Amino acid sequence: MIIVLVLASTLVLLAALLLFAARRSRRKTGIPSGEIFYQDLVGQPLEAKVLRSSRWGISGKPDCLIRTPDGVVPVELKKSKRPPARGGVYPNHMIQNLAYCALVEDQMQMQVPYGLVIYAGEQVRRVEYNEVNRLWLRKVIAEVRVARTLPRVTRNHQMPGRCSGCGLRQQCDQSLAKS
């Protein structure tokens, strides 16, 4: 009987320590506490569906959505271990995250205070979902629509690695990726 009590007490203490460590880690990294209610990660139990917005004319699947007291926070996980210096976010990652903010706000009718981009080195970067960024998102969406009507779009970078990861590299006559 004493062994069972000691074992139970040890397990309760261990659980409390793990919970404390998890909360401390979340606070340290900038990940908000809240309920993860949507995941588009391989092998995860929560179902992720494509979010669509006819108002914005976009669709997508964020990696994760966290319900917090302030609203829903879209989270995007990136493989890159080297985010921009001084707390920045790459512009393409920022636009993607802003699009997820707009999708959640429009389709789910939920408040979205900000989004997060988490780089592989576990560096969490916050993307403010404010009026300035909404206007930028609207402008980028309009530019993409125009570009999609053009017979040819010119590559806008000199990065072979970016071409290697592109879904259109097989059809692209400007690809820097080695075949």
Regions found by a protein language model. Name each.
Residues 34-55:
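A short acidic/basic microdomain associated with nuclease active sites
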Residues 2-3, 39-43, 172-179:
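Short flexible/disordered coil segments
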Residues 52, 88-91:
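Short coil/turn segments at secondary-structure boundaries
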Residues 49, 53-55, 59, 67, ...:
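Metal-dependent nuclease catalytic regions and adjoining charged, substrate-binding loops involved
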Residues 58-86, 96-102:
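Conserved catalytic cores of phosphodiester-cleaving nucleases, focusing on short active-site segments
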Residues 91-113:
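Metal-dependent nuclease catalytic cores in nucleic-acid-processing enzymes
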Residues 1-33:
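N-terminal signal-anchor transmembrane alpha helix of single-pass membrane proteins
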Residues 86-89, 128-129:
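Short, solvent-exposed loop/turn segments at secondary-structure boundaries
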